[in-house]
Amino acid sequence: MNRQLITLATLIVLELFSTVSVQAADLIRIGILGIDNYGSVAYTEFLNKPHAEGVFEGMRVVAAYPIGSDDYPESKTLGDKWKDQLSKMYQTPKDPKDAVPPIDWVDSLDELLKRVDCVMIFSLDARLHRKQAESVLRAGKKLFIGRPLASSPEDAVAIMKLAAETKTPCWSGSQHRFSTGFAGMVNHPEVGKVIGCDVYGGWDPKTPEVDKFWLPLHSLETLYTIMGGPGVVSVTCASTPTTESITATWKDGRVGTYRGIKEGAVKYSATVFGDKGVSTAGIYGHGIPVMGVVPTNDEYVGYKPLATEIAKFFKTGQVPVQPGETLEIFALMQAAEESKAKGGAVVPLKNLWETK
């Protein structure tokens, strides 16, 4: 009898170890490069959640390289703050079964790349992104880069070009692009086919030149989402002490605008014009408006929609935003700067993707 019990117990233990080994072998190991951008914390909360289900199942942030930037005074402060949060995340649950293995902190990019299958770049200083991305892409690791993709159109093109050459999937995006209240305006039943869109959001006139793509990307990605994607052929830009106003004309004649708010209350939303009606868009983190009423008492989803897209990407290798669209947004911002320098002249858009 005792021998039978021992044999049964042994089989159970072996089965458990076998299951754990299979799970470990199947685990998609994610690494973070640079943690001084809050995205490092926001998305890890979803990717490392105990007993994750659905798209988040079978993956985890396992290692991070907390490199910072000497040119950003806040880099060290934020890096230390987010490192503390990441180190403690899911480490002291009420139920021990809910504990998650701690994130390993490494001291080199080479060491990070040895430990992971995929990488997320969250360095606050976008000037670092190109060099960081080159190492990741040459190592063949699927790569997501927190906005902005790069600090210049030239660096953005170089990153996407290398991704294509190495056949390594890579993309970047703002969480606003996937927020339900914005993405849900495409084919909204009260709007119909989108004819035009006016988006608005923050614009900091004191932003250093290297950060000029940081804030506008939230609203410009919202604009591209609602308008249905790329196709801009020309841009004009008017600039005053209170407003940065960019008007983009699509090749089919539709017009979209971006109002960058420099002074006064800052909100992020849009007005959408369609063949059935005109409606305000929702607000970040909430659902689509109904009869012009924007929901605010529904579930706040925040970063979850983009976290979902990142998880899908790491599982499938399919990017939700094509390189050509990302580079067109950089071309639009470049053309807007040129238009502003020429007193608001119409500037044709360059196709950065085809000329890469």
Where are these regions (language model features)?
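A contiguous active-site-proximal alpha/beta segment in oxidoreductase catalytic domains
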Residues: 149-209, 219
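Rossmann-like dinucleotide-binding domain that binds NAD(P)(H)
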Residues: 198-266, 324-327, 331
